[in-house]
Amino acid sequence: MDVAALVSGGVDSSVVVHRLCEEGYKPAIFYIRIGMEDEDGYIDCPAEEDIELTTLIARRYGCPFEVVDLHKEYWERVVSYTVETVRRGLTPNPDMMCNKLIKFGCFEERWGYQFDRIATGHYATTDLLNGKTYLSTAKDPVKDQTDFLAQINFAQISKLMFPIGHLLKSEVRAIANAAGLPSAKRKDSQGICFLGKIDYNDFIERYLGKKEGRIIELETGKVIGRHQGYWFHTIGQRKGLGLSGGPWFVVKKDIKRNIILVSRGYDPDTQYGKTIEMETFDFITEDAYEAGYWNREDATPVTFKIRHTPEFTRGLLYKGEKGYRLESEERIQGIAPGQYCVIYDEDHHLCYGSGMITKGR
């Protein structure tokens, strides 16, 4: 079986190569270059260090290694999506789009199709049910990345291998140390993948600029501060508002008037909601309604996430003529339109897919 391994130079993907070789595979190693650089060299991404470490791994295990450049595709499909989503006052998820469109999209179209399986360092697993592959959660609940993979499709999940998904992060580190891998002591990457060392707000300012507006207390209608543009703020945001007497939370945005509405939380109804609406929902393996597993006339008990945290929330999923509605068992803070709601089974093991949030209340 021919296997391609997507390697970043970090400890997780390095251990992937180590384990594949231990199991008798000789994977072809690929490093995807996606770091952004405009005409001014604005974006600083540590690609050279990544490539150097990946080269060492490839040499050690005698694996073929290729650097593939998807810079242009990444700009056109992921970075532009991020900027446009923010411009519309919504909350983007560029990491989710990167997996769907770049790592398992463009790469598959140009290189991956030559291989039987694609291995990555994601913390996730798969299960085979009724002859079909399902995305499943990882052993490590803190590192689990299924929410970032919840927009991929059946063709993509069917080819994927997650060699470290059944390990805790501490176990991955221990394997790397025992094997003497060059990335064993390397820190985990943080933040959005294309930004490198660049601050997110600096990036947004570069492409959307600044526009001063009012910060208004929702309950009283009083102007209590100024902001530099609604696009710098997301629903549920607590830090970076520059207000005293808090904590303050962003609860609404008036896009047309460039107004940020905030609350200190003494009225929980302004901050928390139980209803999530989605116009569409993308199943990874198969549509559970069409397959007959779920009945559109009944509520389906599920667990879900609306942000990258170890915790799952219970709820009931409904399918109607105009889309999908999720009723949460408990009130949740910061339901942000544009973000994705990721749906799991009741045991938060199988990940069914995700839908973009259009409204929360």
Curated annotation (Swiss-Prot):
Q: Where is the active site?
A: C98, C193
Which GO CC terms are listed, alphabetically? cytoplasm
The family database entries (Pfam families) matched by this protein are listed as:
tRNA_Me_trans (PF03054), tRNA_Me_trans_C (PF20258), tRNA_Me_trans_M (PF20259)
What's the EC number here? 2.8.1.13
Which residues are ATP-binding?
A: L6, V7, S8, G9, G10, V11, D12, S13, I32, G121
**Where do the segments described as Interaction with tRNA lie?**
143-145
* Positions marked as site (Interaction with tRNA): H122, Q339
Write down the Gene3D superfamilies for this protein, in alphabetical order: Adenine nucleotide alpha hydrolases-like domains, HUPs, Translation factors
Q: Where is this region: Interaction with target base in tRNA?
A: 93-95
Name the cystine pairs: C98-C193
Q: Where in the cell is it found?
A: Cytoplasm
Q: Is NAD a UniProt keyword of this protein?
A: no
Where does the record place a coiled coil?
none
Please provide the Gene Ontology terms (biological process) for this protein.
Answer: tRNA modification
Sorted alphabetically, the keyword list is: ATP-binding, Cytoplasm, Disulfide bond, Nucleotide-binding, RNA-binding, Transferase, tRNA processing, tRNA-binding
Classify the main location. Answer: cytoplasm
Please write the reaction equations for the catalytic activity of this protein.
S-sulfanyl-L-cysteinyl-[protein] + uridine(34) in tRNA + AH2 + ATP = 2-thiouridine(34) in tRNA + L-cysteinyl-[protein] + A + AMP + diphosphate + H(+)
What GO MF terms are annotated? ATP binding; tRNA binding; tRNA-uridine 2-sulfurtransferase activity
Function, as annotated, reads: Catalyzes the 2-thiolation of uridine at the wobble position (U34) of tRNA, leading to the formation of s(2)U34.
Family of this protein: Belongs to the MnmA/TRMU family.
Q: What is this protein called?
A: tRNA-specific 2-thiouridylase MnmA
